[in-house]
Amino acid sequence: MAEYIMAVQNGRNIPTEDKIFGSSRRANEMKAERGEDAVINATIGALLNDDGDLMVLSSVDDTFMGLEPEEYASYAPIGGTPAFRKAVVKAAFGTYQPKGFVEAVASPGGTGAIRNVIANYSCPGDKVLTSDWHWSPYGTIASEIGRSIATYEMFTEDRKYNTQALQAKIEELLAVQDYLVVIINTPAHNPTGYALTVEDWEKVVEILRNVAPEKHVALLVDAAYIDFAGDEEEQRAFLPVLETLPANVLPIMAYSASKTYTIYGMRCGADICLAPTKEIAEEFRRVCEFSARGSWSNCAKAAQSIIARIFSDEALLARVTEERAEIRDMLLARGKAFEEEAAKVGLTIVPFDGGFFVSIPCDNPDALSARLEQEGIFLVPLAKGLRVSVASVSEEKCRLIPARIVAAMEAEAQAQKNADEEAAAQA
């Protein structure tokens, strides 16, 4: 029986349901059946308070409520309003003043930003490089426009960032393709919570300095969670390192205003380049705007107006920054609690520094996730393990989950042992 009736597959692997949204749907169904207290839903990639309600910065909400109709109902320019494009650079870079040529192009969240970089800085059929632990929609975005994902092992055996594996994979891919997009999601990497150090970045840049001059690399920094990783200025300490790259390597930041300003549903982000020449920066803006026009036309104006207003009012900006710091501290406390309890019960987690997510390496994550769901604990199964959203559950629940995972692992291992013994007995 054909998998498709009228639609054309076009080489894509299209699941019947998104894993993350599917897990969350099942959690909500169990809540409706058994009650709120019977379920821990650690799948959601948004900040929720301890009662499970969405946390929205009141300062941002007040700004939204104060918009004039012209600020939300009229079309925005394809690349974003001038005020937004100026403000989003400040939002993304903080106090850092780039020395190169900067251009920003609006996108519907960080997802749109990633899409446009892949579309414009790689060729159909090319592989896009990222780490083995990565946000799974990278693969969806790539396949949707005729590319695919290649990965390198993110961590060494001593749990350090694996620059040797990165270098080997870059060399392997550039031996067969002239263009390469390298995606590095940091700080507060999704799904692990890891953040590259400045020393890590210096090694990455050294690797890219050795790329042959006739090759072209777009270094895409997916900084979606940068403002929830820790001190906002410390998390941007790597930015000057990016401006030491050679002319054939273009650093681009995919920035998510949707997350930083807790307006997830407004889908607001930007691609921001740090180009060595004016010509490269202008080309960046032109090609990204062209792709935007052919994909979503232009982005919703309301969020752009909110960001522009915030950065035009120092008192409002201070209020937003202070309020975000409060919920960031809550988030970091949850992550620390999970990390502490994992250590107590002997649960290995992937190196974690901060952010929305923690990951647990394991065999057969789908089976383990299904077992935990039977007990009312909903996590996201990945290729190499399980993802826990500490953003969406209380600190108390963050302390409960590790022991429950260990128990489920032991039960799953025993079930597999029993199955193997039964199979051997029947052989």
Language model segments and positions:
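N-terminal small-domain helix-loop-helix segment of the aminotransferase-like
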Residues: E3, N10-G109, Q416, Q426-A427
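PLP-dependent enzyme catalytic core of the Aspartate aminotransferase-like
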Residues: E17, K90, G94, P98, ...
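Conserved PLP-binding catalytic core of the aspartate aminotransferase-like
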Residues: N49-D50, T321-L372
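Conserved core of the PLP fold type I
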Residues: E68-K215, I226-L245
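Conserved core segment of the aminotransferase class I/II
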Residues: A87, E243-R324, R328
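Generic enzyme active-site microenvironment
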Residues: L220
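Walker B catalytic acidic pair
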Residues: A223
